[in-house]
Amino acid sequence: MAFTRKRQREQQLQLYSKERFSLLLLNLEEYYFEQHTAFHVQHQGSQEERKIRGSLKICSKSVIFEPDAISQPILKIPLRDCLKIGKHGENGANKHFAKAKSWGISLIFSQIYFIKEHNIVAPYKIERGKMEYVFELEVSGKVEDVVETLLQLHRASCLDKLGDQMAMITAILQSRLARTSFDKNRFQSVSEKLHMECKAEMVTPLVTNPGHVCITDTSLYFQPLNGYPKPVVQITLQDVRRIYKRRHGLMPLGLEVFCTDDDLCSDIYLKFYEPQDRDDLYFYIATYLEHHAAEHTAESYMLQWQRGHLSNYQYLLHLNNLADRSCNDLSQYPVFPWIISDYSSPELDLSNPATFRDLSKPVGALNAERLERLLTRYQEMPEPRFMYGSHYSSPGYVLFYLVRIAPEYMLCLQNGRFDNADRMFNSIAETWKNCLDGATDFKELIPEFYDEDVSFLVNSLKLDLGKRQGGQMVDDVDLPAWASSPQDFLQKNKDALESGYVSEHLHEWIDLIFGYKQKGSEAIGAHNVFHPLTYEGGVDLNSIEDPDEKVAMLTQILEFGQTPKQLFVTPHPRRITPKFKSLSQASSYNASLTDSPVSPGEESFEDLTEESRTLAWSNIAKLQLHEQYKIHKEAVTGIAVSCNGSSVFTTSQDSTLKMFSKESKMLQRSISFSNMALSSCLLLPGDTTVISSSWDNNVYFYSIAFGRRQDTLMGHDDAVSKICWHNDRLYSGSWDSTVKVWSGVPAEMPGTKRHQFDLLAELEHDVSVNTINLNAVSTLLVSGTKEGMVNIWDLTTATLLHQTSCHSGTVCDAAFSPDSRHILSTGVDGCLNVIDVQTGMLISSMASEEPQRCFVWDGNSVLSGSRSGELLVWDLLGAKVSERIQGHTGAVTCMWMNEQCSSIITGGEDRQIMFWKLQY
């Protein structure tokens, strides 16, 4: 569980330091500066004194004394409550302390807190009234320095304005940091080379710890100014798996480092004082990681989730991580949705849609009556307006859920108190009801509700959390009737999260929290508007000159909750079934290199199974060159293969169409239609007609049986770049900025008469069209232009569905995935882009060192042909090149794959065609 794992790490560090003390004993925005071994001098009787040994902690707003004996309470004296501070004997000390030595420190104050007596976590005990405590330092020579420090901090704490207090404390802190530097003796090796050093704070939930960051050629170090909880935190760069820039207080100052694949528990979270320091450190580590770890984007995770390679839970974790949500920052703790809405039935029916919460609405809009009241207030509110006065995620809400495993955090947040017993997390059903009906309660859930650790539901620490109005003590969380145990409750929550209903609708909730409905007019329409201070860019803290206003703003930002960083600005696509059924293409062919017929002697298309295709693609890196032939005088531009696999037809920039026999390994025919280059070719079913497109603006039909040109379609005003065919319709893309749809092109064209080609539709573009392709059933067409635009067209209505500008320069190739859910495009910019067909959203982009001119793909993996002649195998889900295969001596310009995915033919600028076989 997220918080449990985090807490375990902190407890391990506390064991290292052997202290009961933790930074959670400090106030919010307070710093721990130094500690001294000391004795608390207590008066017993008229002459007797008792000395309790311990550690005196000097903090920016308090003095804390931690006795060595755990039976004794920790003492916390707020500096603002101190009446006098000085060396013993200078404060008009109580006569009972007459024997206390001169190196004692005397504090006269009006209020003191007693904490963790017998090491029991409980609300702080408070004693009020004028009193004096004396502490003797073990090193007497430090008394004057400590007293001077306390007096300086006392002056800061007593300033009237919070802004002035913060400014003075910050100046003291920066002065201490400036007088110190990282101890180079802490390097792991004398051979380490220092790269940079700067000041920063280590961030843990609710608290930060200032110190020095140092990075060398092998390690990242953080040395706390106070040496707590250990002298140095060291991370070996070789162990780093991921790093993320973070917002802290809505400012670009954070950096989080992960050395494991755990998306919830990082190894260190640093907050810098200057964005440039953060960026420099990030760049250095990122440069180191380039060859050690793959970087994932929201789009790459989306693709994995869509295709079923990530569970709903895993995907939400990744999105939270990318959106700056961190377990180290309770104002930006990972947020998960309420899924179940039925907490009263004896049995949970996950097949009933009524069991689930409406994921298209924020929590505040689930109750229509409450929403109406909120909207009325919203309309009457002056600008800037907001619908909800509280957020769906805040430190208070997180600790509301986690108080049973994180009581010290709640005490820190609530100034030493637990919340009222009736307002605590007592019941799942009551909490859900309050989220539906409460005037100010709009909270979502946290990852723990979908994990395996039940400890946050059980009072295993036997905490005294108070007594409710009905007389019952707050203990374990009351579960719904359909949950037989905490384990059963979490399991059913997990089952609900991964259910079919949620998989179909989770994208709607993502739109609200991480997506395009988070801000602007879409947020207003979705009733999803929160206080401006919760949004990134809602306020510029650096522009606020009034220190009091600045502190107030920062406090509100940290305590009120923050909206996640926006990851998507267009509608999030739905999830799709990861396993797709093969669609028959017996009547669909085109010059696209992925939709060619199958050779007899191999399995027919109808007999192909998903397993056989999957097996072939899983071994795609095992391609071996079988044969190669140089049959053209210029670059090869298109490939088509006969049904029996014996004849290969190719087009070239040398203006010829050639027919090559695989059996005799000889060139059988060479046909020239004009003196200009041919750009693509396709073979109609029946193997009687080859169609070729040309740069002379025409499309040529060649009869194989009669051995002559049988027709010419003069349909464009500029070069025809690509042709496709399906069910008697021909599709032609051209540099004249159009794609045209023609009827009257039957599968078996008689060679004895000319045809009447009727123009059915003209799909107009703003610039030249370089490539086109059809989806499996030819209801959609994708076109790629010379200015980097990828267009998706609905062929049933001849309308443009989506237009995505995703390349800088010409789109080389574009094709649908076998299930028609995605489009892959390549361009001269070297990028491979994946686009969601439903939304037109760019969901993945990978950069290669050079343009990939052509490709075939199965939706998960890609085989592409590069400008240098290599064949590259890409793992789209892993966003990486998994294999490089040497092929042509020039660019690979076209590619064909049979339906079994076991045979491949490539054509190149080196004028060759190469025959490849899978060996497995």
UniProtKB/Swiss-Prot annotation:
Among InterPro entries, the record links this protein to:
BEACH_dom (IPR000409), BEACH_dom_sf (IPR036372), BEACH_Domain (IPR050865), GRAM (IPR004182), PH-BEACH_dom (IPR023362), PH-like_dom_sf (IPR011993), WD40/YVTN_repeat-like_dom_sf (IPR015943), WD40_repeat_dom_sf (IPR036322)
Q: What is this protein called?
A: Protein FAN
- Domain BEACH-type PH, by residue range, is 189-286
* GO biological process terms on file: positive regulation of amide metabolic process; positive regulation of lipid metabolic process; regulation of membrane lipid metabolic process; tumor necrosis factor-mediated signaling pathway
What stretches of residues are WD repeats? 631-661, 673-703, 715-743, 764-794, 806-836, 887-917
Claim: Cell membrane is one of the keywords in the record: no
Q: What GO molecular function terms would the record report?
A: death receptor binding; signaling adaptor activity
Residue stretches making up the GRAM domain? 176-247
Ranges for domain BEACH come to 290-575
Annotated GO CC locations = plasma membrane
Task: Write out the function statement from the record.
Answer: Couples the p55 TNF-receptor (TNF-R55 / TNFR1) to neutral sphingomyelinase (N-SMASE). Specifically binds to the N-smase activation domain of TNF-R55. May regulate ceramide production by N-SMASE.
UniProt keyword list: Repeat, WD repeat
